[in-house]
Amino acid sequence: MTSSRFIITVIGSDRVGIVARITTVMASYNVNIVDISQTIMQGIFTMIMLAEAPKENFDLAAFQQAMDAEGKSLGVEVKVQHEDAFRFMHRI
């Protein structure tokens, strides 16, 4: 299966259900978590994931919109970036 990898970041005030609801949206788009790191710093929830989605029949714009909408309903900020763009922006 060919795939495309993304970096997904989630930041906001901690509350119950953030991981469950964000990953439910991901599963509905057949997006798999390759790696994940999550922590809470003084009440601020932070999570970064390396995720993989099928290249075929994957609508990135719709996925980004769904993730953004879920983030807004949770009161957190969700960013979805293609791995290549993320690496380019964060190179030294």
Swiss-Prot record:
SUPFAM superfamilies recorded: ACT-like
Pfam families xref list: ACT_6 (PF13740)
Record-linked PROSITE patterns: ACT
Transmembrane segments: none
ACT domain span: 7-81
Similarity remark: Belongs to the UPF0237 family.
PANTHER family cross-referenced by the UniProt entry: UPF0237 PROTEIN MJ1558 (PTHR34875:SF6)
Protein name: UPF0237 protein MM_0082
Organism this protein belongs to: Methanosarcina mazei (strain ATCC BAA-159 / DSM 3647 / Goe1 / Go1 / JCM 11833 / OCM 88) (Methanosarcina frisia)
Highest classification ranks of the organism: Archaea, Methanobacteriati, Methanobacteriota, Stenosarchaea group, Methanomicrobia
